[in-house]
């Protein structure tokens, strides 16, 4: 059956695939025929993700991408890729008067610097095909929306969003497309385990969404799949907002 979103035969690396959007993206990409390589810090979680994938031959690599050395170690283990989903991320909720150099460093290393360094190394080692697709998981916090105590996270994602456009421009001649998705709040463990948010807080926040609910990981994965697929072969330097209308307010 004809499917313009097929990923059949494509080899795709997904970072931050231990849970949440990364895990779900790996699952959905495997259903569409992709050969999946996932990476993250926790081997047990990566093994669990692999167990959910459709098809055979998928791989995982345990790694910490918060340093250039960690990125280099990963790249050395990789085959040539058709796609990269740069999804790994961390968040810290802090009012501005409590920022510290250590926290800034921790968040920016993972959310902004790691994607930049990983892509640099993939290019230098010729590990991305012509054509290929790179998708960055950013956030509406780094695109259109602000909230108290979320400045460090939002600033790191804003940096990633700006970088994506420069990468898209510079790499277009190599056949490498670069785009970003910007989710609003998504029902993942990060929400469920957030002790700073009470049930009343979540209900109140959900009312800010015109569609009156948070997103599901699959809804983000489907947009990522579009950008990875040949259906998006003329799309680069674009931002796709997936937020139930939250950024309309």
Task: Report the location of each language-model feature.
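Short C-terminal tail/terminal secondary-structure segment
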Residues: 2-3, 225, 236-249
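Conserved glycine-rich cofactor-binding loop
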Residues: 18-19
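Alpha-helical segment proximal to the catalytic Tyr-Lys
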Residues: 124, 169-170, 233
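Substrate-binding pocket helix/loop in short-chain dehydrogenase/reductase
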Residues: 95-96, 103-108, 205
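Active-site helix of classical SDR
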Residues: 119, 156, 164
